[in-house]
Regions:
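Bacterial N-terminal signal peptides
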Residues: 1-7
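A sequence-level/structural motif corresponding to short, flexible coil/turn segments enriched
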Residues: 13-420
């Protein structure tokens, strides 16, 4: 039996700078099943929004009964750890979520995969309300024309070949399902990230090629449910994992590639890549490749101030890396942490998962160190989350602080709220 442990920390012990600050924490545990998972986190102005996948009954004494084998779940929590509402979306078949984002209008977007294009059923549990079942009968079954500081995507591998439809659910801030759109895909793949725009969203994803490799795509989706053309990047060895919408309406996309892109060939074993892309035609306007001899590098997160986070791996060294770039592609500053298996960021906060003791982070194996950084990348205030095996997501929100979603060593999922 898995558990979702929600740990909200008003103040955290400083892990990367002094003075130390300590305070009690509040903890709430929500029962789940063995295969339940959290795939990402975002927020509105007042609440944290968590997306995941569930099987069987959920939420203990207030069950959201299963709709199919696997269903998508969206759940909201306030800063005290209270579950404000939960929404379960699915069909009689399997439906899984792969990415989440919240736009400037506080509408929640959840991308995923489904076995069919049929209309979903929604089971909702608002705070202090009885569970009800609602069918979105006003929706069409399919659409014919087929963060800024949120890091939320978790990949689903291996991709099941029977999940043939990419789906996007649109939910309001009170947990009401507004729309659900579906688009058939010819190749196995999934959405890795959602970038909110002014008139809809951009889907960033991958497709599995016949050779078993990965190529990436960007595709627009209007608020009316119209899917735009897919623009592809790479042929069989390019993976895009995150991105942001820039002030000039271009997209910054990050990930990794082991093939030539925009006439720039791979220099290491696998290069970390930063692409500046025109969303109207998919043209690569700029490309920055981060590489090293024999190194496998990958960027996992990006922020609007051109700060990126990821990893670098060689035969002898694994590192977590956080860097900020200029608009011309030069490195303004970079922080490297030996013995780290993951590093993600937003525009002001970093989360690093360590697999061994690290003197710079003052951490030990299994710690997720979270810190707020200054304009030079140096830590200002930090905290640590022990006994962790994975960083699922990172979100900062004015008025709420920072929330980190992690997977613990016992298999549970933990949300930790910090005061910066």
């Amino acid at each position: 039996m898995a558990a979702f442990s929600l740990i909200f920390v008003p103040n955290a012990e400083a892990a990367t700078c002094s003075p130390k600050v300590a305070a009690p924490f509040l903890s709430t545990t929500i029962s789940g099943n063995q295969n339940d998972e959290i795939i990402g986190i975002s927020s509105t102005k007042k609440i944290w929004i968590v997306a995941g996948n569930v099987v069987g009954d959920f939420l203990g004494t207030t069950p959201l009964n299963p709709l199919g084998g696997v269903d998508s779940l969206v759940s909201a929590f306030d800063s005290s750890g209270v579950n404000v509402w939960s929404l379960r979306v699915g069909t009689s078949e399997d439906d899984v979520a792969t990415a989440i984002a919240v736009d400037s209008k506080e509408q929640i977007w959840i991308a995923g995969l489904a076995q069919s294009e049929k209309n979903p059923t929604a089971v909702t549990t608002p705070e202090s309300a009885t569970s009800t079942v609602q069918t979105q009968s006003s929706q069409t079954s399919t659409v014919q024309t087929f963060n800024p500081d949120s890091v939320t995507a978790q990949t689903v591998k291996p991709v099941r070949k029977d999940l043939k439809f990419i789906t996007v659910a649109q939910v309001d801030k009170n947990g009401l399902l507004i729309n659900r759109f579906a688009n058939a895909t010819n190749n196995s793949g999934y959405v890795t990230a959602i970038i909110p725009g002014s008139t809809g969203i951009f889907l960033i994803g991958i497709e599995i090629t016949k050779s078993g490799g990965e190529r990436s795509f960007v595709q627009s989706l209007s608020s009316a449910g119209e899917f735009g053309s897919k623009f592809y990047f790479g042929k069989s060895a390019t993976t895009l994992t995150s991105g942001v919408l820039n002030k000039d309406k271009t997209l910054t996309l990050v990930g990794n590639s082991a093939e030539t892109l925009a006439n720039k060939s791979v220099a290491g074993k696998v290069d970390g890549i930063i692409l500046n892309v025109s969303p109207s035609d998919g043209k690569i306007l700029k490309i920055v490749r981060s590489n090293g001899v024999g190194a496998t590098r990958s960027w996992k997160s990006a922020a609007g101030n051109l700060t990126v986070g990821g990893t670098s791996k060689t035969k002898s060294l694994n590192e977590g890396v956080i860097s900020q770039f200029s608009t011309t592609g030069s490195v303004l500053w970079s922080k490297r942490y030996a013995g780290a298996s993951a590093a993600i960021n937003n525009s002001a906060v970093v989360a690093v998962l360590t697999t061994q003791s690290n003197s710079l982070l003052k951490s030990k194996a299994g710690d997720v160190v979270v810190y707020q950084f200054d304009k030079k990348g140096d830590p200002k205030l930090g905290g640590r989350i022990p006994l962790s095996t994975e960083i699922v997501g990172l979100r900062s929100q004015s008025g709420l602080g920072t929330c980190v979603a992690t997977k613990a060593s016992d298999g549970s999922f933990v949300l930790t709220q910090l005061p910066f």
